[in-house]
Amino acid sequence: VNWKKVLGKIIKVAK
């Protein structure tokens, strides 16, 4: 799992 990509997706959804 690419955590950097996952975190980026979560941040995009959160914003």
From Swiss-Prot:
Any one of the GO CC terms? extracellular region
Q: In which tissues is it expressed?
A: Expressed by the venom gland.
Q: Posttranslational modification, per the record?
A: The C-terminal amidation is required for full activity.
Q: What does this gene product do?
A: Antimicrobial peptide which assumes an amphiphilic alpha-helix conformation upon contact with membranes. Insertion into membranes involves Trp-3. Penetrates into cells once membrane has been permeated. Active against Gram-negative bacteria (E.coli (MIC=1.7 uM) and P.aeruginosa (MIC=15.8 uM)) and Gram-positive bacteria (S.aureus (MIC=14.3 uM) and B.subtilis (MIC=0.8 uM)). Has cytotoxic but no hemolytic activity. Binds DNA in vitro.
The record lists the effect of G8A as: Slightly increased activity against all bacteria except P.aeruginosa
Q: Which residues carry this modification: Lysine amide?
A: K15
Localization in the cell: Secreted
Arranged from A to Z, the UniProt key words for this protein are: Amidation, Antibiotic, Antimicrobial, DNA-binding, Secreted
Q: Which GO terms describe its biological process?
A: defense response to bacterium
Tell me which family the UniProt entry assigns to this protein.
Answer: Belongs to the lasioglossin-like family.
What is a single molecular function from GO for this protein? DNA binding
Report the protein name in the record: Lasioglossin-1
